[in-house]
């Protein structure tokens, strides 16, 4: 199983790149984790936000692998504690399909992305900046993997 993070935005601050890459390099070879970035639409005073969301959504869905399980990152999604996420990761592995996790831009995800999702995951009831979500998702998935592999990274 391959994990794919599909995220809106291509110019992240150095701390985001550094944090994300730190966890990305830790993933085992039998569970590759990759980042696919789609460009954010131009937002200005007269921007058509609905159209921007639609376009970003189209690009995100086009970037996912055919047949991939799509999981959105969204506030109203299912909150998982770390052991629950580890169990979820195991179920995804048993399913045999690759998993694409979608992170929207400043206004969130398009209705098409939400409709295509088999699952929706809520990291927090807080509104989080989408660059930070990249790092949190990578760390959370690495921690979940460490539980399933009996790796000492996670401590109860």
From Swiss-Prot:
Domain of life: Bacteria
Binding site for S-adenosyl-L-methionine: 73, 104, 123-128
Protein location: Cytoplasm
Gene3D superfamilies for this protein: 3.40.1280.10
Reaction catalyzed: pseudouridine(1915) in 23S rRNA + S-adenosyl-L-methionine = N(3)-methylpseudouridine(1915) in 23S rRNA + S-adenosyl-L-homocysteine + H(+)
Acyltransferase keyword on record: no
Signal peptide extent: none
Main location: cytoplasm
Keyword hit for Zinc: no
Gene Ontology cellular-component annotations: cytoplasm
SUPFAM superfamilies the UniProt entry points to: alpha/beta knot
Xref: Pfam families: SPOUT_MTase
Known EC number: 2.1.1.177
Family from the record: Belongs to the RNA methyltransferase RlmH family.
Function of the molecule: Specifically methylates the pseudouridine at position 1915 (m3Psi1915) in 23S rRNA.
Assembly, per entry: Homodimer.
Protein name: Ribosomal RNA large subunit methyltransferase H
């Amino acid at each position: 199983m391959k994990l794919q993070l599909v995220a809106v935005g291509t110019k992240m601050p150095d701390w985001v790149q550094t944090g994300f890459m730190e966890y990305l390099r830790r993933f085992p070879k039998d569970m590759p984790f990759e980042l696919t970035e789609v460009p954010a639409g131009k937002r200005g005073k007269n921007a058509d936000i609905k159209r921007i969301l639609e376009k970003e959504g189209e690009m995100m869905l086009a970037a996912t692998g055919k047949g991939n399980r799509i999981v959105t990152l969204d506030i109203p999604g299912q909150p998982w504690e770390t052991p629950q996420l580890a169990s979820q990761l195991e179920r995804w592995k048993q399913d045999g399909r690759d998993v694409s996790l979608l992170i929207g831009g400043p206004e969130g995800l398009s209705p098409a992305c939400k409709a295509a999702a088999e699952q929706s995951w809520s990291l927090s009831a807080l509104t989080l900046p989408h660059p930070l979500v990249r790092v949190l998702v990578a760390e959370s998935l690495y921690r979940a993997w460490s539980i399933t592999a009996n790796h000492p990274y996670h401590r109860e």
